[in-house]
Amino acid sequence: MLNKKEQSELAEKFRCTFKDNSLYRLSPSSCMDESTLRMQLLWIQQTMEADNLRAAASMLAKRYSFVVVAALYSFIVFQKKINASTKNVSLHTEDAETMWLPKVFISETETKEVTEDNQKILLDELLDELFAHHIEPIWSSLHKVTKISKLTLWENVAVYIHWLYDLLLANEEIENVQVQKNLRYVLEEAEGHHFGSYHHNPLSRYSSPPPYVKKQKQEIRVRQTCCLSYQTGAEETYCQTCPVICKPKKGVIVHE
């Protein structure tokens, strides 16, 4: 079970909550129903001042990625596998704001202890729970409703997993070897079936080492697809890793 300290840490780092104080609840099952999903996307579009439903879909995918990094953080740092099933996790909005930063509501805090003997088995179980039976069905619905490419949606998740990777490697209290082993497995080595009906891991295409970007004067893992965040809000702003500003002349996929 997640103790109070661990719950507090997940709340601080990944906007997790363990109390239902929501004004607006977005459940996985509702995201898998196309008619309900369309209504939810219209609400997100209005709230975030998005230009279209495709941009709203990408923002939903980015917010949903916090479910993934919270579960992976618990697995690696606490050595506890949380229940990341569709029945135990949902996005809760506690106040209306343009940025729309919902919290990850985790209903039951029961966990499975990760040991050296069961680590591989439990990590595969977590990936099945997170991706094959949870994220992938939502991505499929988003694609059907808005025609957004799954390449964009999977890259949204990959970006946050790489962010978690960097966050953990910078923490001297955490064993780097274990971090690298687990996240390399998730990003590159895990078989495609853990993510849905895939022959290959859909995250692996986004795991190349970050190149040096002369324009930004630093190494940046430039996105292959645009997340469309510049199509939200009153001002047109771009992510630092945006392909539109980092490599605008190389056939970048903007409207996936």
Q: Model-flagged regions — what are they?
A:
Residues 223-247:
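Local cysteine-cluster metal-coordination motifs and their immediate loop/turn environment
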Residues 1-59:
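Generic N-terminal leader/targeting and pre-domain segments
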Residues 48-217:
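Hydrophobic, aromatic-lined core segments that form the binding pocket/scaffold
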Residues 78-79, 248-250:
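Secondary-structure boundary elements
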Residues 27, 68, 161, 231, ...:
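Generic short alpha-helical hydrophobic face used as a protein-protein interaction/packing hotspot
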Residues 250-256:
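Compact nucleic-acid interaction/catalytic patches
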Residues 26-34, 53, 145-149, 175, ...:
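General structural signal for secondary-structure boundaries
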